[in-house]
Amino acid sequence: EKRKQTLIAEGVIAVIAVIVGYAGYLFLTMTVEAPGGPENAGALGSEHSHAGILVKIFGDEFDFSAPAYQIKSPWIHFESRDGTTIHKHATGVELEYLFNSLSIGLDDECYVFPDGKSFCTNDEYSLKYFINDEPVSDIREYEIVEDDKILITFGGETPEQIQEYLSELRNQEIRK
């Protein structure tokens, strides 16, 4: 009887050892990926880049520092109640993923707020994008690199007003 109990105890210990060993193997070989991430993104932590952003709608600055826009994705986000610095934590993460995570629609003609209010290019007003002072037609597929500056405007701005916005953005601190 004692021998039987010893064999059972040894068997239980062996099973526990196998489980612990397997769990240890999985832990040591796992990647830092989380489900639901951006397509073609690298592992979390594969990059840490920062970019400044300024969004002006009819001259009014959009505030990403509100809690509704803070850390909505581990891959790319705003954090620390700062609405002017984008933090990217993996390679292959495009700006479209950031805006989707904030429930903001974005394409080459429209900027759509989470409440559905949209600002679309028409005969009087236009949506414009600038990356590092250069006009671009769309930013969705753009992947930020360290110290980028991104301007999004909607309205009927003069070239002088655009230059003022770009200057404001250039002087804006990127919080790292």
Locate the predicted segments by residue.
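Ubiquitin-like/PB1-type beta-grasp interaction modules and other compact soluble beta-rich domains
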Residues: 1-176
